[in-house]
Amino acid sequence: MIYLHAIDPIAFSLGPVKVHWYGLMYLAAFFSAWSLGRSRILRGRLPGVDMDGFSDLLFYGMLGVVLGGRIGYMLFYAFETFVANPLILFKVWEGGMSFHGGLLGVLVACWLWARKHRLHFFDVMDFVAPLVPLGLGFGRLGNFVGGELWGKFTQAGWGVIFPHAPELADQLPAQIQAQYAAGALNQLARHPSQLYEAALEGVVMFVVLWTFSMKPRARYALSGLFALLYGVFRFIVEFVRVPDAPIGYLAFNWLTMGQILSLPLIAVGLALLAMSRRAPVLQPVLPTPAGVEAAK
């Protein structure tokens, strides 16, 4: 049944402060990363690092996600707007985050943290890779709740009518509701591409990576698998997702910025998986009893 999107993006209010679902999804993402990371630390998946060290790594990662995601969005998707008004970079409440920018931010953050702790960069990235997909899934759910980043038109029974889409933006909620009840808006249903990405980049990637990480793997393998899966899934979903308005299609009337940015990920993923075939396997080293107590 075609669904009319009518979810309030505001979860609740505390006096004058309005708490948005998207912000809560970020909290859920960081909590899931902490919980999964704690489990991996207790199983010795990053030898020599205790919970204090992991908490430090998570803080670095959070900064990388937020700063990289925002800067990446400005550079990849709103560069002209940014050049005209550089201060818009700080208006995070207006929305605008890029996964690929966030990924670059996390890479820089993990490199700095690995250098600080004298660890191999890819040992750190292999540790982090299984912690990320659930956060991606929560982020896409936040996009859906916010009614943004919708897909192309579809007549599939699970299509969603988004009131903030251009074709309905000038109508009042009561008008939209009346037309929906009469079945007059069915032709305006769109692919819920946010949910497709939540399922693929969130659930599927988490199950695959977490299962794969249960046994010690060669260096580069987990990082390579993450990059490959994300690149492929994002490239596919872009075919049913409306391209970002300021940019549109970049070539062939179908190639999007998201697809162009995903191609290097696919190539890097394949290269890392090839490198892993000759790389050493990082054997787990269980933390000391004191470290286990500190994690409780």
Curated annotation (Swiss-Prot):
- Parts of the chain that traverse the membrane: 10-30, 57-77, 92-112, 119-139, 194-214, 220-240, 254-274
GO cellular component entries: plasma membrane
What does the record give as EC number? 2.5.1.145
State the top-level EC class: transferase
| Keywords, in A-Z order | Cell inner membrane, Cell membrane, Membrane, Transferase, Transmembrane, Transmembrane helix
Where is this protein localized, as stated in its record? Cell inner membrane
Q: Which residues form a coiled coil?
A: none
Sites binding a 1,2-diacyl-sn-glycero-3-phospho-(1'-sn-glycerol) sit at R140
**Alphabetical GO biological process terms:** lipoprotein biosynthetic process
Q: Kindly indicate whether the keyword Cell inner membrane belongs to this entry.
A: yes
A single MF term (Gene Ontology) = phosphatidylglycerol-prolipoprotein diacylglyceryl transferase activity
Topology of the protein relative to the lipid bilayer: Multi-pass membrane protein
**UniProt keyword Lipid metabolism present:** no
Q: In which pathway does it act?
A: Protein modification; lipoprotein biosynthesis (diacylglyceryl transfer)
Domain of life according to the entry: Bacteria
Q: What does this protein do?
A: Catalyzes the transfer of the diacylglyceryl group from phosphatidylglycerol to the sulfhydryl group of the N-terminal cysteine of a prolipoprotein, the first step in the formation of mature lipoproteins.
Q: Give the family this protein belongs to, as stated in its UniProt record.
A: Belongs to the Lgt family.
- Record's protein name: Phosphatidylglycerol--prolipoprotein diacylglyceryl transferase
